[in-house]
Amino acid sequence: MAALINALDSTPKQCGQNGAVEYGWSNDIREQVLQFSGQIVRTDESKIEIMADKLNKILRSLSWNNSCNVLSDAENKELMVVLYKLIALTRDIVDGKGEYALAYMQVFVWYEFYPELAMFALDKFVLMDNEHPYGSWKDMKYFCNYVRLKTKNDNHPLIDYACNLIIKQIVADQQSNNKALVGKWVPREKSRKFGWIFIILAGKFSPQYLSTATTHEQRVKALTKCKMEFRKVCSALNKELDTVQIKQCAKVWSTIDHTKTTSITNSRQKKAFLNVTKAGKQRSEEDDRIVCAENYKNRIQAATSGVGPEIKGKRVGLDDFAKEAMKLIEQSLYGTSNVNQFEKDALNSQWRDNSKQTGALGEMVAMVDTSGSMTGAGAIYPALSLGIRVAEKSKLGKRIITFSAEPTWHNLEGINDYTECVRELHKASWGMNTNFMKAFDMILNAIIEKKLKPDEAKGFILAVFSDMQFDEARGGDMETIYEVMTKKYADAGRKLHGEPYELPHLLFWNMTCGSGFPVLSTFKNTSFISGYNPSQLNLFCEKGLGFLSTMTPWSMLVQSIDKPRYKCMELKMMEFFGYPDYQ
């Protein structure tokens, strides 16, 4: 209870963009950590910088506490571990949010305080024992570019460390039959964005040439030799990797094995594989491309009919699914080009494959915000996909509420294809204001109409996928949406049964980076999550409503990072600070 009082005392209320009362950034350090985690969602560079400033201040406060003891040792350790493991959760493409830019920002800020911990985290983006790392080798060149833009220093220690990781893996791959994909992601010399990294890597791979050069002319010749040798090594590695891109460059498209093509390549190159232009017309008359297209069509047909496995879609972003579905729908509605049925079938197959990473959910109802702020920010796309995923996995059946100026109840039973689900949701009111209370009243009115008993009225999870910029609710002075909802529910229960209704478990899933919060870290029977990755829904799989009623946003955050994959981060933190007794 003391934690609740402290959070309330330390966290100001404010009016959000659309008039609803919300909580602002707190002065309480624990609350700040929770709020920071809830704003880790894909955004632009300016907001990433705001998040970097928030993280800097939190780390500064926790570091300062080590000498001033404002928090107990146990409290300080807990917050440091949670904050450090957030790096893993942010980048993890398997079981986390899968965000790269926000992860790079966190590593960079941590480096300012604890360089060793920052480098260890970066290491885990590409190297993990006996399991998939948090990211991929693609991260190294993008991270180097991020640091360069931040520091204007090509020789920054973090860049040096990342390049050393690449070189070490290349050397290992030369001697191994089980190669990593580092060769695929090594920057090319002619790349405008990453060519400068190639020069650094070439010098590191053959330092013996540069070490003996004493004059400028000798250094130029030595570097030329370094680059030539490094090009040969990278070319040889890529040939052994036998990637799709290598076959495309070699003009042997017909030899591509579409059962092995990665989910991202499948997503981005459907039209290329089908040998069609954006307008749906044949792209090339070369036999090689025509055979490739026929092979790909056969692959799609096998997946659609159930004869073959689904087309890989595990790593495709939920926003990309919805964007492609919307394009296909618009093409069919307005006749801007020929809609290729194979493209739709491939997308639906990838969706089915992607769905396998989410387990069965309990009694959960999805509410998807389709207001103008969501469409303008592009957050509408992942929100639609998350809503459909919940509907597919919920015990309550395939149903979704969308809300803008008016709420709409969608029954998706009998609609099997993802693209058709998106088409159905697109019929609702989009692009208007964010009248969340009207959507909430739709549910409450149904409960009142059916005269549900108090234990029935709270017997589900309400998952709200929104940017949290709700319209003003008609409550008392400075009452938040949550407070207004609590009172409405309680009053309805008293009127019907003489005892208050309790709210269902409220899952506020934040879809954009902002500065307002619907609940505090200590509010029971609520969750506050953010991001585009559906794997976070697994936190609610096989969880009884009794268990969820005791959960708070803070306990849910702790649970989200309490995974075996992130244990190495915790152990590193304990080793670094010398507190092995941390539990």
Where do the PLM segments sit?
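Long lumenal/extracellular ectodomains of secretory and single-pass membrane proteins
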Residues: 1-382, 392-583
